[in-house]
């Protein structure tokens, strides 16, 4: 069937016009929601309880400061005695204890509000420390200072100076943790009561320990000088009261691979890869090879690349050789490409225009799109009340409609003549 270039074009133009005449107002894009951040680790319940009590105590100070301090001392003392333990003050304090975004605080306050009220009205005198009464004794979320774990066991070094004052007792003050002492640099032992590796006792008494660093590679020493070494760190050896570096590369301690060589460093060693030209080596570069790798040959004291392309290694028709480091490759000569293992001549197509490869139907679609865009643009300008463009638009629609009708008439006449 012959192509029908403008079939359906008039309905398309009418739809285009109605679309532009009924354009809605601007559509505002809503900002996309922020990406979900990684969940944060929840704080230990004891830390939440401590923060709640700290905020409660600040609220007590705030309510006194905001409600009194006007200068009339007698009146303030009379009113303060009534306000101090009143329900009004408690409500004011509790309202400001948790920030709006602190979910953990709000959850804990909801669970413990009755306990706080009981302490406020009945237990303040016998238990003035709200933290101890609420967090440790009642809710059992915390332990006294210097203790840890479900049973509030003493930290190493005792409750008065956990970890000797030179470390942190894991879980101290909470119902969790292992009680292990994380000692400061230079200190060691179960309760951080000793000097660690590489440090010596510079000062010690019944309550005080000062650990200072040994000289460089010393592991144990009696003082800061090099001659004070008693034991050396790994990779060093004590020689005439001094620590000297051990050359592991000359011993069985160095365990490098067959394609590596050993390099001594201070207190240790490292293995580095041999050069590509080497099949085993004693050092860096092609001049330290034990044997040459395939594709290399001994030239003097070095292993150098063999140029395989100097001999006929690419016998295929229209092939040429390219030398590479330690090898070679066969490629097709310029103007040829590889196909099924052989080099065939490339067929360079003659230059063709943009429309040369388009089918007739594709040309029809492109034609319709072009005319549609022009008419839609004219319709938009005409819809804005521009008389000139309105006239042009009406004329264009009329011309296109006439063309479409004439094409249709031609097809009807052609069918009649052919006896359709």
Swiss-Prot record:
It catalyses: Catalyzes the rearrangement of -S-S- bonds in proteins. Disulfide bonds join 46-49, 155-169, 163-181, 183-192, 278-281, 309-321, 314-330, 332-343. It is an enzyme of class 5 (isomerase). Keywords: Calcium, Disulfide bond, EGF-like domain, Glycoprotein, Isomerase, Membrane, Redox-active center, Repeat, Signal, Transmembrane, Transmembrane helix. It is found in: Membrane. Glycans are attached at residue 205. It is a multi-pass membrane protein. GO terms for cellular component: glutamatergic synapse; membrane; synapse. It holds the Pfam family EGF_CA. CDD domains: EGF_CA, FU. Residues 1-29 form the signal peptide. Residues 153-193, 305-342 form the EGF-like domain. The chain crosses the membrane at residues 363-383, 385-405. The keyword rRNA-binding does not apply. It comes from the Eukaryota. The keyword Repeat applies. FU repeats lie at residues 208-255, 268-315. A motif (CXXC) lies at residues 46-49, 278-281. GO terms for molecular function: calcium ion binding; protein disulfide isomerase activity. Residues 30-362, 406-420 are extracellular. InterPro entries: DUF3456 (IPR021852), ECM_structural_protein (IPR050751), EGF-like_Ca-bd_dom (IPR001881), EGF-like_dom (IPR000742), EGF-type_Asp/Asn_hydroxyl_site (IPR000152), EGF_Ca-bd_CS (IPR018097), Furin_repeat (IPR006212), Growth_fac_rcpt_cys_sf (IPR009030). Belongs to the CRELD family. This is Protein disulfide isomerase Creld1. It comes from Rattus norvegicus. The gene is Creld1.
């Amino acid at each position: 069937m012959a192509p029908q270039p403008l079939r359906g074009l008039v309905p398309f133009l009418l739809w285009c016009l109605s679309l532009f005449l009924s354009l809605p107002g601007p559509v505002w894009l809503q900002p996309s929601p922020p990406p979900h951040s990684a969940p944060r680790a929840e704080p230990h319940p004891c830390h939440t309880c401590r923060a709640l009590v700290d905020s409660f105590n600040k609220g007590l100070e705030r309510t006194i400061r905001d409600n009194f301090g006007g200068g009339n001392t007698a009146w303030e003392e009379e009113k303060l005695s009534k306000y101090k333990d009143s329900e009004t003050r408690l409500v004011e304090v509790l309202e400001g204890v948790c920030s709006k975004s602190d979910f953990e605080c709000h959850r804990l306050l909801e669970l413990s509000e009755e306990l706080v009220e009981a302490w406020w009205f009945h237990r303040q005198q016998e238990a003035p420390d709200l933290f101890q009464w609420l967090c440790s004794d009642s809710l059992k979320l915390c332990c006294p200072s210097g203790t840890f774990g479900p049973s509030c066991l003493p930290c190493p070094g005792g409750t008065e100076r956990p970890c000797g004052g030179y470390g942190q007792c894991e879980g101290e003050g909470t119902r969790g943790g292992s009680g292990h002492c994380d000692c400061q640099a230079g200190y060691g032992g179960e309760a951080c009561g000793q000097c660690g590796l590489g440090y010596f006792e510079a000062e010690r008494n019944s309550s005080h320990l000062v650990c200072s660093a040994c000289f460089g590679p010393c592991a144990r020493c009696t003082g800061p000088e090099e001659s004070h070494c008693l034991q050396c760190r790994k990779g060093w050896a004590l020689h005439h009261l001094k620590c000297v570096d051990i050359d592991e590369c000359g011993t069985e301690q160095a365990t490098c691979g067959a394609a590596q060589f050993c390099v001594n460093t201070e207190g240790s060693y490292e293995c580095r890869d041999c050069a590509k030209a080497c099949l085993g080596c004693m050092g860096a570069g092609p001049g330290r090879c034990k044997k040459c790798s395939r594709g290399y040959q001994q030239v003097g004291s070095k292993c150098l690349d063999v140029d395989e392309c100097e001999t006929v290694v690419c016998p295929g028709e229209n092939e040429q050789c390219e030398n590479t480091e330690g090898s070679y490759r066969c490629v097709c000569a310029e103007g040829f490409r590889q196909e099924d293992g052989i080099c065939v001549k490339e067929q360079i197509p003659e230059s063709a225009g943009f429309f040369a490869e388009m089918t007739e139907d594709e040309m029809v679609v492109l034609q319709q799109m072009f005319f549609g865009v022009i008419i839609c643009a004219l319709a938009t300008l005409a819809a804005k009340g521009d008389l000139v463009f309105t006239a042009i638009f009406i004329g264009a629609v009329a011309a296109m409609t006439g063309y479409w009708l004439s094409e249709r008439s031609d097809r009807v006449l052609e069918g009649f003549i052919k006896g359709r």
